Amino acid sequence: MYIEMIDETGLVSQEIMEQTLDLLNFAARKTGKDEKEMSVTFVTNERSHELNLEYRDTDRPTDVISLEYKPESPILFDERDLEENPDLAEMLSEFDAYIGELFISIDKAKEQAQEYGHSFEREMGFLAVHGFLHINGYDHYTPEEEKEMFTLQEEILTAYGLTRQS
């Protein structure tokens, strides 16, 4: 999986960047999404607040914002298009590979790690996997959806070695 990592805060250690990258690749393999592409941006609470207001109309910072990429309309082409532009099929497959982007608030991750009594590393991993599942179509609006998503989320984190005691 190709993952673009961006640290807008300048506060994320190389270890956390590498753990996030490794964990998301692990999650991608576990869910059959390893041929996809996404981005992860680490932000402050201030930036998280702005994004939450812009995309979710919620006037407060949040821990992770998941923006699933869904093309507005299908791309239609015919055989003649492929004959005229042999690179078109490859370009479209790359376009189809992009699944979305995550914005993780470093400030919220630190607050929540302390609140829940586990490590910052565990909280960062939790937020990354939670967001990853959202951009892959999982949600928790109903009890059934919540059970499915949270079970898979915990399976991934445990198999990776990031337990609540981590």
From Swiss-Prot:
Cofactor section: Zn(2+)
GO biological process, one term: rRNA processing
Keywords, alphabetical: Cytoplasm, Endonuclease, Hydrolase, Metal-binding, Nuclease, Ribosome biogenesis, rRNA processing, Zinc
Keyword match Nuclease: yes
Gene Ontology molecular function terms on file: metalloendopeptidase activity; RNA endonuclease activity; zinc ion binding
Residues binding Zn(2+): H130, H134, H140
Pfam families in the record: YbeY (PF02130)
A Gene Ontology term for the protein's cellular component: cytoplasm
Cofactor note: Binds 1 zinc ion.
Annotated compartments: Cytoplasm
Annotated SUPFAM superfamilies: Metalloproteases ('zincins'), catalytic domain
UniProt-listed Enzyme Commission number(s): 3.1.-.-
Task of the protein: Single strand-specific metallo-endoribonuclease involved in late-stage 70S ribosome quality control and in maturation of the 3' terminus of the 16S rRNA.
Family under the similarity heading: Belongs to the endoribonuclease YbeY family.
Name of the protein described by the UniProt record: Endoribonuclease YbeY
